[in-house]
Amino acid sequence: GSRLRQEDSPPRIVEHPSDLIVSKGEPATLNCKAEGRPTPTIEWYKGGERVETDKDDPRSHRMLLPSGSLFFLRIVHGRKSRPDEGVYVCVARNYLGEAVSHNASLEVASK
């Protein structure tokens, strides 16, 4: 069988996101940082669904930062559509496994 190289290690989350309360139209950041080798890829999920970022759509108002954090250029929140409010987790993966962060809720403050 193939032996693991000494340096390779499964992901672990070293910075978890925390709950946020933000105003509509304001920027916001959910932090996430993971370690591992090879460097884990980071994806965000909200309510079990993968969050689309600028990596999926260059016009997206959500950006995946190099650190793994999720940055909202502005929080989108309307009567009918509330795409940003919810409970988020970040998932770090490499070929050795995956690590899931704590839940963080993003709440939009009512004016």
Spans of features found by a protein language model:
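Immunoglobulin-superfamily
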Residues: 1-111
